[in-house]
């Protein structure tokens, strides 16, 4: 029984000799950063965006709580978010949040949505919410933030 429990606990970490997760970024997609209309910013640096998604910045100006919504596992948006913003593999992302919650630096990991449509609906409804969307499929009713002064259509946009 103990061996089974240990195997189950260690399985997500990868066994010795197994290949690590690779960050695979889908070609051609550009991530747009979308937020609730009341979020008091229009432009973030990539460093500020990382702090938000890593849980190091938990409030917008005026004490509005940041609510991070991440795409579903396996989606193109999630793959690009992990590679460009988190700079982590799926496994590293999970371990990061387990450790952060264990150290009581966060109450929980970002909320994972079941679909990008649900993410858009929640961003519209939840004050302080921030998420991502394929820049070619921006949902109506959300605020699109610029990153490093650039929109997703601009040359040199960092999230492609």
Regions found by a protein language model. Give the residues of each.
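Generic structural signal for short, solvent-exposed loop/turn connectors between secondary structure elements
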Residues: 1-3, 140
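Sec-dependent N-terminal signal peptides
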Residues: 3-12
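C-terminal segment of classical bacterial N-terminal signal peptides
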Residues: 13-17
